[in-house]
Each structure stands twice: as structure tokens, then as C-alpha cells.
Amino acid sequence: MLIARNFILMSKSLAWSQASLQPWIHDAIDSLGFRSMTPVQASTIPLFCGNKDVVVEAVTGSGKTLAFAIPVLERVTKCMKENRGSSGLYGIVISPTRELANQINTVFHTLLQFYPEDQPPIKTQLIVGSLATVREDLNAFAENKPQIIIATPGRLLDFFSSNAVKRSTVEMVVLDEADRLLDISFQNDVVSILKKLPKQRRTGLFSATLSSAGDSIFRTGMSNPVKISVNSNKAESKPQSLTVNYMMVNPETKIAVLINMLSTLQYKKCIVYFPTCASVKYFYSVFQKLHPLEDVNLTSIHGQLLAKARLKAMNKFTEGDVRTSKHVLLTTDVAARGIDIPEVDLVIQLDPPTDPDMFLHRCGRTGRANKVGRAIVMLNNNALESDYVDFMEVKGLKMSEVESPDVIDAYKAFSKNLRNLMLQDRAFHETAIKAYVGFVRYYSKHAATSIFRLQTLDYIGLAKAYGLLRLPKMPESRFVPNDRMPEDGWLGEKIDMNKYAYADPAKEKIRLETMEEEWNKKVNDAKRRKELKVKNEAWSSKNEKKEGKQERREKMKRKREAIEKQIMNESSDEETVVDWKDLVREKKQKTSGISGSFDDL
């Protein structure tokens, strides 16, 4: 069922011939092989063409791009006729990523190939960061005079800062992946852009998970919008042609399991989602050096690549010939939204994304347009992560379990090769550590915090999966049980880090020079500490001698004073004794004198 505000449309696809469109658009649709409209197209195109603002929520792969591209081209064609071919900016499509913007631009170009040559041409311009400067974009705009702009928010806001861009003629604005454009990352830029545009315009919001945008929708300036929701009364939030499986895996064997699936499963093109840019760069390098995959054409893109490199890699994967080999794209969520790559029939997620809505977008890169597709997510083999299955079922996505392949022998062989590769180049180990630390940070940001908890993460198994020689020192290591923590963090045989060299001679030279400087600094510091200690000891000894001398002086003084006092006391007693003896002697003399006088008588 389709719910469009207060009325209901049957989810039956309609023939394109029943749609009131420009003849050249009918020719384009017929040539592209589309025999009937999808439900979202059948409901949206008449309303969006008929001066209605629309809010469209439909599952991935349901044909939303054509649902807004055709109304935009219809409106631009009418404006061109009304203005007798006069050029002006009539339509704007805003996308959150360069890749999606480039894809939308390609869809417009495909349709415009059927535009009548005797009419003034309709032109589009792609305005995204890194491909060109703002000045170059402005020069191209002034020279080509496009009627339609497909852009990313940041660059478009910079573009509109120039008075050379006349915005008063804009008739239609489309926000593709609107929930992403209205979240905290882009909302301010998008709202600022919309405020610069005429209020009397038609606005369309399109996404697979628009409900998460919440009240932000009301900041887009829409007038009495019509909400269109495809299959909103069904529990399933994925296309029926898409099968979603989950697999419980021990963390250390994840890469071995991935290699097994990429080697044994039947598919044409596969997208493998890694959690971070660092992990994409690291494992792409591992696969390039160890060559564990035969007859597989490997490509990688991530958010840290420059725009030109990203578009080149995406085009390589998109245009890959499936008749000659399998094609695998290692990527992050930069390739999760809106990207429509033909013949992608397998999606593998090493770990669930931090945002549950992104899980649906990742899975939706396959099983598009009623084609059969399969998505597999690996969950760490513990009780908590298994709860993610129930968590997603509440959100309308049912998953069935598939058994993990037996990869013990393959894991041991791969780990041995990876360790040997590590020992050849210190830089490779530093890249692995960066990817490992990035994953731990990524894991801590999960929305489902009750399921993905740092306390329950298997850090040892994860470190082995990344091929680390030694656990890095980080706060989260406190969650590793003491009985599992290896001695000094070594995950294998201990190596001498001073002799662990870079393969790049220039980097190794710098390392050795730095190590020598640090060693000399340590020696000099130790020497200075020793000298300071001796100096301190000398000063301390001198001070002690001085204090001892002073103490002896005071002691001698006290002793001298005591002796003098004693002498004084003794002198006083002797004088008393002498006086007494003198008196006795004097008395004796007197007595002797009297006795002599009697003798004379």
C-alpha cells in the first residue's frame, strides 16, 4: 500500500504509457527498457509534476531517482518553452556524497540523450568539492548556463555566495537521501541553501529511512506536503528480492572467513563494508601484497580519498566486466547511500554500522529493481552481539543465520603470511595499529550501546585479526582479563623493536637517526643527573661539615662555660677555707702568746 497524506494508492505498478509526460521522456523510458513504473514512481511522478511538495519514503532500489529526475526534467522543459528557450537555473538536486551526486548527474545525462536536437539544449552541472575550485565552477556556470545543478551541500553553499548566480528562477529542489541531509552534519548548510531560494518553489524529500529526520522536515520550507510511503503497512523494510543473513564469527577469523566467502560464493560484483577508512586502506594493502583472492578484481574507496580518485575507483568498479572476473569493492559508508551499481548481487559487512539505519542502506546496494541480491553481516561470537538480530527485527528487518565456514587451517596459514609481511616493514605494523585503534573508537560510537559494549569486546581476537605483533597501550586494554593478557602485550614471539626496520630506506634512515638522538639524549641526561647528584652530594657534605663544626664550637663553648663556672665555684670555697685557717692560726698565735707570759712569772 502507498499512503499519500489522506488518501491511499494501490501499490500496483502502472504502465509508463499512462503517465502524462513529454514525448521525448517516453522515448527515453522505452529505450532504457522500463516497461512499467514502480510503486514509488507511479505515486510520486504525478504529484511532483502537479505542483505538489512531496516527502517520499521507500525501500532501497525502488526507483526513487527516476521518481524525481523525470518531474525535474518535465518542469525544466515547460520553463524553457514558456521563456522561449531563455536560459535560467530551474532545478537543483542536493546529495550528501560526491559519488551519489555523480550518479544522479549520469541519470540526467542518460535521459537527456533523447532530448530533441531542434530545441534549445537542457544542460546540467555537477558541483561537488575537490573536482574543481569554486571559481572554476562559477566560470563553468557562466559559460554553459545550465538549467539543472546537482551538488553537495557544502560546495553549493559556497557557490551561492556569489552574486553571479541568479537563484530567483529556481522552480524545483530535491533533497536525495534527505534524512542524511537533515541530520546534524549537513542540516545548517541545507537550511541556509533553502533560505536563499524562492519560497514559491516545489520541494521533494526522498529517502529509504526518512522517519529518522523527525521535525527537521519542517525546516525545509515545504508548503502542505504530500507524504508518500511505499509498503509502510508491512513489517519488512527491505525489498522482497533481497535476502539478509547474519553469521556468528570469532573476531580473529573474520578476515579468513571473508576471503573464504569471496573465493567460494557465486556472485558478479560484491561490496565489502569495513568500519573505518583506516581499515579499508590497511586490508586493501594486505590483499594487494598477499594475493589471497584469485580471479577477483579488487577496488577500494573511502572518505579520505580525493574526489577524483574516488570517482575513478567507482567508475572502475561500475564498468567492470563480469564476464571475465568477479569484482569486489572494499569501502566504508561513503558508498552506502543511493549508489546504484549494476550487477551487485552480494554485500558483506564485516561489522554492523554505528547507525542502524545505515544497515538498511548498505544492504540496499544489492537486490535493486527486483533483482536477486544477498547481504551478509558478521557478528562477533558473543551473547551480546547476537542480540543485534532481534534489535533489527524490531526495526522491520528480519535476518536468518548462516553457518560460518570452517577456516581454521586457512586462518593459521593467512596469519603466518601476515606476520611475515609485518616483519618485513615496520610501517605496515604502524598502519595495522592505526586501523585497530580506529576500530575500537568506531565500536564505542554504536547507537545500540547495550549490545556493542567496549567491556565485552574481544581485544585479543581483534588484534590477531589485524595481524598485530603487540597490543598497543590504550585505556581500553583494562577490559582484557588478566588471565588472557599476554606478557608485555606480545601476541607472538617477542621481537627487538630497536632492530624492527622500515622497508623504505629513507624512513629507516630517519628512524635510526632519531633513535641515535634519543639514545644520546638519554646518555646526556643520565650524565647530567649523575653530575647533579655529585654536586648535590658535595654541597650536602660541605653543609654537613659546616653544621658539624658549628655544633662542635657550640659544644666547646658550653663545655668551657661549665668549666669556668666550676672553677669559679671551687675558687670561692678555697677562699672560705683559707679565711678559716687564718682565724685558727691567729687564735693559736694569741694562745701561744698568753702562755709565754705565765712562764716568765
Swiss-Prot record:
Ranges in a coiled coil: 507-575
Any one GO cellular component localisation term in the record: preribosome, large subunit precursor
Domain Helicase C-terminal: 257-419
Keywords for this protein: ATP-binding, Coiled coil, Helicase, Hydrolase, Nucleotide-binding, Nucleus, Ribosome biogenesis, RNA-binding, rRNA processing
Motif placement: DEAD box: 176-179
Region (Disordered): 532-576
Residues bound to ATP: A58, V59, T60, G61, S62, G63, K64, T65
Residue ranges of domain Helicase ATP-binding in the record: 45-228
Family named by the database record: Belongs to the DEAD box helicase family. DDX55/SPB4 subfamily.
Protein name as it appears in the record: ATP-dependent rRNA helicase SPB4
Organism this protein belongs to: Meyerozyma guilliermondii (strain ATCC 6260 / CBS 566 / DSM 6381 / JCM 1539 / NBRC 10279 / NRRL Y-324) (Yeast)
